């Protein structure tokens, strides 16, 4: 086992990364090894997908399968060995199909089929023990003693960034949005990473390419969500329980939320969003469901306590899931799509009867709690509509600064930095937030500036796209570069989606971003220095010191 993809990873003087019997996230060594093997198989598929594409052969099933299966290897997504093995076997079948199609296309074109790299020729074992014995072939740091640590760090930056992009591709696909050109570039990068490079410049360029690719993916996902559910609107949301039977929907998949709402209509069940699903409450399409009553709980890391106290059924539509046995609710939590946990019921297809039956069998909430409301829904359309008013308030001096404070949440005590930063932001500043990092402060009162709320919740982590559109619009209005705006980005990272959002921002030329609370363990000190020199990227320090720098206070 070697896994170093999330903030929780082990850090010691002897080296970084989880490499023992179990990772800090709860992932067993065998699961980690199988995930590495799956990635290796997917890279082999992408080699053939790329070569076949050069001859005009495109398999749309493969184009959607590879990102989806890759998504299953993200932090806190799938801990079920049998599901990972099934993905690996499916990858082997797709690779063989593409191999045949490629060779046939070569014959038709009168070309000789190329000799492809080992990753495209690897023969997957037929049993779990055999697959585990093959794991060293796919170990991410297998050649660590032969290469410079910066090369390994750059490879991992690319791999983990591409994982985040794969997740957004799958979210878009669920909403009917795919793009053959995006899929082709995705395969090219997967294939490149499958034949480990030692060229630092090429790896760095690839990291920026991944950021550019993800910008297009986020635009595609934004289109999928707004075409399906309308543009988010400023919406007041209750964050306290109401009396009645209950289902909690977590993750990011709004299509699943829609299906659950349709199937629970008239059955006396209240539906709540959780975590990154909170922004769904701002979409017009969901406002017709009176039994979508609000948001319950906070960010992913608190779920073992919050789910244990939730007297209903829970559905995990995507990341993040952690051990449900700790809170003894494994019999009433259900997984979907790429999510998996051993022993937890997995819902296949669009029928949520098993979830509904479980919710009806449970007590539900016995009384209404006193409401606590928050306002959400300041995504792209709402921000653009407010832009003239915002500009007027900037010009008259009422608004002097903007902060984008968001990203992933986590359980490290150092993350209180983000709460303290939001609290300490000057009263003449506006705070934009997105991702589950918002839960560090989204229930606090920040007031307004001439009717403009000082806290603007943009949405999910992928709604960084909305923030980028606002920044571009403001830079055009003020006729300046984005980096000349009175805007500072402070991003909390935990896993791979945050990595690819960061790469997206860097690839667009956004500078002087702060990230925290701790830098990714796979980034060497030298790589961190290079990123600081090139982009002004730096780690958070203290709220007082960072605010002085951001506000140019001497």
Curated annotation (Swiss-Prot):
Enzymatic reactions: A + NH4(+) + H2O = hydroxylamine + AH2 + H(+)
Binding note for cofactor: Binds 1 [2Fe-2S] cluster.
Cofactor: [2Fe-2S] cluster; hybrid [4Fe-2O-2S] cluster
Binding site for [2Fe-2S] cluster: 3, 6, 18, 25
GO terms for cellular component: cytoplasm
Coiled-coil stretches noted in the UniProt entry, renumbered to this chain: none
PTM sites of type Cysteine persulfide: 408
Amino acids binding hybrid [4Fe-2O-2S] cluster: 252, 276, 320, 408, 436, 461, 495, 497
Keyword Plastid: no
Protein EC: 1.7.99.1
GO terms, molecular function: 2 iron, 2 sulfur cluster binding; hydroxylamine reductase activity; metal ion binding; peroxidase activity
Record's subcellular location: Cytoplasm
Alphabetical keyword list: 2Fe-2S, Cytoplasm, Iron, Iron-sulfur, Metal-binding, Oxidoreductase
Stored InterPro entries: HCP/CODH, Hydroxylam_reduct, Prismane-like_a/b-sand, Prismane-like_sf, Prismane_a-bundle
Keyword field contains Metal-binding: yes
NCBIfam families named in the record: hybrid_clust, PRK05290.1
Recorded family membership: Belongs to the HCP family.
Protein name as catalogued: Hydroxylamine reductase
Organism from which the protein derives: Shewanella sp. (strain MR-7)
Lineage: Bacteria, Pseudomonadati, Pseudomonadota, Gammaproteobacteria, Alteromonadales
């Amino acid at each position: 086992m070697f896994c170093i993809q999330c903030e929780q990873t082990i850090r010691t003087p002897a080296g970084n990364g989880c490499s023992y019997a179990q990772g800090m996230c709860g992932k067993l060594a065998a699961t980690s090894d199988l995930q590495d093997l799956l990635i290796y198989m997917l890279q082999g598929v992408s080699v053939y997908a790329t070569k076949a594409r050069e001859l005009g052969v495109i398999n749309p099933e493969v184009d959607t399968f590879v990102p989806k299966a890759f998504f299953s290897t993200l932090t806190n997504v799938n801990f079920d060995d049998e599901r990972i093995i099934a993905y690996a076997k499916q990858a082997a079948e797709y690779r063989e199909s593409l191999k045949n199609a490629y060779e046939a296309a070569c014959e038709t074109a009168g070309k000789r089929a190329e000799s492809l790299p080992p990753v495209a020729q690897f023969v997957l074992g037929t049993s779990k023990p055999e697959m585990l014995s093959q794991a060293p072939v796919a170990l991410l740091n297998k050649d660590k003693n032969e290469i410079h640590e910066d090369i390994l760090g750059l490879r991992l930056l690319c791999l983990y960034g591409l994982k985040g992009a794969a997740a957004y591709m799958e979210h878009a696909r669920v909403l009917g949005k795919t793009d053959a050109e995006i899929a082709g570039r995705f395969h090219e990068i997967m294939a490149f990473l499958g034949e480990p490079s030692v060229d630092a410049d090429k790896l760095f360029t690839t990291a920026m390419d991944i950021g550019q690719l993800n910008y297009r993916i986020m635009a595609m996902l934004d289109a999928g969500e707004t075409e399906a559910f309308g543009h988010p609107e400023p919406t007041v949301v209750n964050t306290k329980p109401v009396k009645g039977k209950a289902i909690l929907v977590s993750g990011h998949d709004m299509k699943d939320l829609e299906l659950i709402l349709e199937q629970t209509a008239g059955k006396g069940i209240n539906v709540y969003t959780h975590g990154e699903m909170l922004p769904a409450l701002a979409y017009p399409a969901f406002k017709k469901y009176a039994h979508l009553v609000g948001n319950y709980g906070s960010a992913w890391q608190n779920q073992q306590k919050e789910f244990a106290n939730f007297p209903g059924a829970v559905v995990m539509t995507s990341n993040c899931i952690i051990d449900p046995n700790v809170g003894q609710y494994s019999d009433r939590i259900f997984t979907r799509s790429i999510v998996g946990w051993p022993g937890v019921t997995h819902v296949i297809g669009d029928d949520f009867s098993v979830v509904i039956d479980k919710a009806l069998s449970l007590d539900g909430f016995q009384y209404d709690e006193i409401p606590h409301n928050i306002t959400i829904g300041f995504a792209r359309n709402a921000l653009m509509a407010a832009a003239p008013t915002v500009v007027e308030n900037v010009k008259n001096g009422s608004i002097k600064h903007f902060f984008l404070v968001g990203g992933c949440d986590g359980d490290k005590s150092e993350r209180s930095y983000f709460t303290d930063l939001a609290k300490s932001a000057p009263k003449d500043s506006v705070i934009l937030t997105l991702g589950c990092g918002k839960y560090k402060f989204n229930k606090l009162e920040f007031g307004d500036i001439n009717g403009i709320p000082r806290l603007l919740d943009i949405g999910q982590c992928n709604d960084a796209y909305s923030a980028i559109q606002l920044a571009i619009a403001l830079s055009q209005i003020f006729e300046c570069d984005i980096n000349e705006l009175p805007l500072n980005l402070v991003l909390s990272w935990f896993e791979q989606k945050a990595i690819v959002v960061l790469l997206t921002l860097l690839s667009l030329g956004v500078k002087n971003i702060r990230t925290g609370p701790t830098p990714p363990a796979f980034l060497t000190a030298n790589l961190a220095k290079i990123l600081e020199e090139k982009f002004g990227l730096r780690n958070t320090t203290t709220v007082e010191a960072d605010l002085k720098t951001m506000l140019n206070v001497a």
